A protein has these predicted regions:
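Boundary at the C-terminal end of the N-terminal hydrophobic targeting segment
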Residues: 29-31
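N-terminal secretory signal peptides and thylakoid transit peptides that target proteins
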Residues: 2-19
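Thiol/selenol-based redox catalytic cores and closely related redox-interacting motifs
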Residues: 76-157
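Stable alpha-helical elements in mature extracytoplasmic
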Residues: 42, 49, 66, 98-102
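Local sequence-structure signature of Cys/Sec-based thiol-disulfide redox active-site neighborhoods
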Residues: 33-48
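Thiol-based oxidoreductase modules, predominantly thioredoxin-like and allied folds used
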Residues: 60-70, 80, 88
């Protein structure tokens, strides 16, 4: 019975294959979209919205500095204002926008300022905790254009 000796070349090929196998899951994993959020340090519903985003595949950095100045800098008209403002993938997010619609926005890439859920409707993400019971008010997610006009991107009833 003859055995062939393990050569240096075989060892290097085996090591390269093992390295590729171990690295493959990390190389193919999709990066979590990064969201920056500006909010009041005392706002509980903003924290709950951030938790909603994180649970739905986003990486979030929060700034407890308020959001009025950032809202204007991102081009989101005041009329669509809410308690927090965010930025993701070059878009502005205003208010309690569901993660589902943020993912859709990033996939569709419309020419727009971003999405807004004005006013803080009960039942929207972050406004859906036990303190609200089972109450769910209808609301619209608006696609805000660069000219300040908006259209319904998704209705929640």
């Amino acid at each position: 019975m003859t055995h062939s000796p393990i050569t240096r070349r075989h060892s290097l090929l085996a090591l390269a294959g093992l390295t590729a196998l171990v690295a493959a899951p990390h190389g193919f994993a999709a990066a979590r979209p990064h969201v920056e959020v500006w909010k009041s340090p005392s706002c509980g519903c903003c924290k709950d919205w951030i938790t909603h985003l994180e649970a739905n595949g986003f990486e979030v950095t929060a700034f407890d500095t308020g959001n009025t100045d950032v809202r204007a800098q991102l081009g989101m008209p005041q009329q669509y204002g809410s308690c927090h403002t965010a930025r993701v993938g070059g878009y502005a997010l205003e208010g309690h926008v569901p993660a589902r619609e943020v993912h859709r926005l990033l996939k569709e890439k419309p020419s727009a300022v971003g999405l807004a859920v004005p006013a803080m409707p009960v039942g929207s993400p972050g406004m859906d905790g036990p303190e609200y019971g089972s109450r769910k008010d209808p609301y619209d997610v608006l696609l805000v254009q660069r000219d300040g006009k908006a259209s319904v991107y998704q209705a929640y009833r």
